[in-house]
């Protein structure tokens, strides 16, 4: 085989290798960037979302994040790091389909004189509006990650839900109703723990629920059938860690995983029907 024919042969092989297998369609990909704090990096939520999407028939979600423990959205605005983070992630094309915004804990609500929880709905609304404007200037769609009530104060959810839904409506931005799904699980399966010991942060089951809600919200598809075990980038108290070796992020029983998937889909569907 001469050099010219050999080159043509190799080109043909590369084209065939890249083509979808008969009976299979190429999958769409959504690039999703998460902005927030430890409620995102605990159990590597972006990695869970990505891992769940890999095993389902819908779009594949490729994720990245910019997080700091305890950070408010207003601090992400003021520290000046977010614009460069959004435009300089080397693993993707620097274009995002969605940028998910997560406010600090219950900051979206008014300060609670009973619980002592500090809230600043005006700060929350201003920060979300400013960040959403930046996100849209980059050609992406802002999405809101509704947080949950802490274990000791479940009544917080009413104000949290109203705050996220209100600003979501103002911005015409999708709201991932994680807090509402959390409350539904706590009511229907109080034996299924979603918190770590501090009663605030998510354990692996809590993050798995959040990932199912996020997947359903961003894709419009059901997370039912997602794997009960998800592997991904390991994480520690500062966020995801650089590693060539994937870690087991969550391992649930088949029954618990199916229940969380079903609740996530029910809550997202109910929210969209409002």
Model segments located where?
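N-terminal secretory signal peptides that target proteins for export/translocation
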Residues: 1-5
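Bacterial N-terminal signal peptides
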Residues: 7-18
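Boundary at the C-terminal end of the N-terminal hydrophobic targeting segment
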Residues: 21-23
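Conserved catalytic region of serine esterases and O-acyltransferases that act on ester linkages
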Residues: 28, 201, 211-274
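Short, surface-exposed connector motifs at secondary-structure boundaries
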Residues: 28-33, 140-142
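Conserved SGNH/GDSL esterase-like catalytic core that processes O-acyl groups on lipids
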Residues: 30-33, 39-123, 270
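Short alpha-helical patches at coil-to-helix transitions and adjacent helical residues
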Residues: 42, 204-211
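Alpha-helical cap/lid subdomain in secreted, periplasmic
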Residues: 88-207, 216-225
């Amino acid at each position: 085989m001469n050099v010219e024919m050999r080159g043509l042969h190799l080109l043909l092989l590369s084209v065939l290798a890249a083509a979808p297998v008969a009976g299979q369609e190429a999958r769409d990909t959504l690039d999703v960037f998460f902005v927030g704090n430890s409620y995102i990096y605990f159990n590597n939520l972006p990695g869970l979302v990505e891992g769940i999407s890999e095993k389902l028939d819908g779009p594949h979600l490729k994720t990245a994040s910019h997080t700091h423990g305890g950070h408010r959205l207003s601090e992400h605005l003021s520290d000046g790091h977010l614009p460069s983070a959004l435009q300089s992630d080397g693993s993707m094309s620097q274009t995002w389909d969605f940028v998910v915004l997560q406010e600090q804990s219950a900051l979206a609500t008014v300060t609670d004189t009973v619980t002592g929880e500090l809230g600043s709905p005006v700060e929350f609304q201003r920060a979300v509006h400013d960040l959403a404007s930046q996100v849209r200037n980059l050609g992406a769609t802002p999405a809101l990650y509704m947080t949950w009530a802490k274990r000791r104060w479940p009544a917080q959810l009413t104000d949290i839900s109203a705050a996220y839904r209100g600003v979501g409506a103002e911005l015409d931005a999708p709201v991932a109703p994680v807090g509402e799904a959390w409350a539904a699980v706590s009511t229907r399966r109080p034996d299924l723990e979603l918190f770590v010991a501090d009663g605030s942060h998510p354990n692996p089951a809590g993050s798995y629920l959040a990932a199912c809600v996020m997947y359903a919200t961003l894709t419009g598809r059901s997370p039912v059938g997602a794997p009960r075990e998800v592997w991904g980038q390991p994480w520690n108290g500062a966020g995801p860690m650089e590693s060539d070796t994937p870690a087991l992020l969550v391992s649930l029983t088949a029954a618990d995983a199916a229940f969380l998937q079903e609740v996530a889909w029910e809550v997202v569907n109910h929210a969209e029907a409002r």
